[in-house]
Amino acid sequence: MVTGVTAANMTNVLGTAVVPAQLKETPLKSDRRSNKPIMEKRRRARINNCLNELKTLILDATKKDPARHSKLEKADILEKTVKHLQELQRQQAAMQQAADPKIVNKFKAGFADCVNEVSRFPGIEPAQRRRLLQHLSNCINGVKTELHQQQRQQQQQSIHAQMLPSPPSSPEQDSQQGAAAPYLFGIQQTASGYFLPNGMQVIPTKLPNGSIALVLPQSLPQQQQQQLLQHQQQQQQLAVAAAAAAAAAAQQQPMLVSMPQRTASTGSASSHSSAGYESAPGSSSSCSYAPPSPANSSYEPMDIKPSVIQRVPMEQQPLSLVIKKQIKEEEQPWRPW
């Protein structure tokens, strides 16, 4: 038994043993408290980012305008997401059932039983009964002839409309289009396809740029290819001949020359020339002179040198038209200032 240790010493010993443990626990708690707001902030940021991505995906999937649904609450976004996933799940289940051969066989068997019961209905005319049974058989086989024919006709019409050239904006463009592709105007559309005037079959093909082109089949015999080339050459020759005839007709048309406007100088010149001309009214050997060039409108009478164009016999004119008119010019007095 130790009797020399006092109470104060005992407290010092206990204090020295307990204090290090408390010092070790306090830093961990302080670190957790300081890191907790940061972790909470990061967690909220992740949630908000995921919600924003969900909103974008849901609006794109449901084909809604993002401008009208820019402000969606978090609950709305989650609700729309759940509904969309449920719809996708139902669609996948329906597709799996439709692809399952057992379910398909069961459906066909039930449909066949219904058709048999329909065929037993009393009071139906034989023609109407046949049409009804034919319609039901087409439905069970998945063949809808009328709808298929309508879709095919619409596709053919759209292809034919795309193959036709656009209307020209000028006669030159029209002639160029006719010379470049004369075979486009002779294409015949039938139920079996498209045919050229010489009987060649062509296949409408969509090019990478989106336009439609008529392509010859690869299995075309060499003789038919030669015939097609000869036909195209003949069409081009006809187009060139038509263009040459149009150019020749345009050259044969008379050209119209614009007459110059009368000015003071031209009026005086014409008065002098008319005075000399009126002196011989009955002469049959008089010449007609060409008018001055319109390019030089401001000229002097002395610079004019008329050129003889042709001799035209003049007819006898009345006396009142050939009498020379005397113009009295008043002499102005001379003033020195």
UniProtKB/Swiss-Prot annotation:
Q: Alphabetically list the UniProt keywords.
A: Developmental protein, DNA-binding, Nucleus, Pair-rule protein, Repressor, Transcription, Transcription regulation, Ubl conjugation
Q: How does it assemble?
A: Transcription repression requires formation of a complex with a corepressor protein (Groucho). Interacts with gro (via WPRW motif) and Topors.
Q: Which GO cellular component terms are attached? A: nucleus
Q: How is it modified after translation?
A: Ubiquitinated by Topors.
Single GO MF descriptor? protein dimerization activity
Any Gene Ontology biological process: posterior head segmentation
Segments carrying the region annotation (Interaction with Topors) are: 29-48
Q: What is known of its domains?
A: Has a particular type of basic domain (presence of a helix-interrupting proline) that binds to the N-box (CACNAG), rather than the canonical E-box (CANNTG). The C-terminal WRPW motif is a transcriptional repression domain necessary for the interaction with Groucho (gro), a transcriptional corepressor recruited to specific target DNA by Hairy-related proteins.
| Region: Disordered, residue numbers | 146-178, 259-311
Listed Low complexity bias regions: 263-301
Q: What does this protein do?
A: Pair-rule protein that regulates embryonic segmentation and adult bristle patterning. Transcriptional repressor of genes that require a bHLH protein for their transcription (e.g. ftz).
Give the motif span (WRPW motif): 334-337
Q: Where is the Orange domain?
A: 107-136
> Where does it live in the cell?
Nucleus
Question: Pfam families from the entry?
Answer: Hairy_orange (PF07527), HLH (PF00010)
Q: Which gene is annotated as encoding this protein in its UniProt record?
A: hry
bHLH domain: residues covered: 31-88
Q: What is the name listed in the Swiss-Prot or TrEMBL entry for this protein?
A: Protein hairy
* CDD domains in the record: bHLH-O_hairy_like
InterPro entries cross-referenced by the UniProt entry: bHLH_dom, HES_HEY, HLH_DNA-bd_sf, Orange_dom
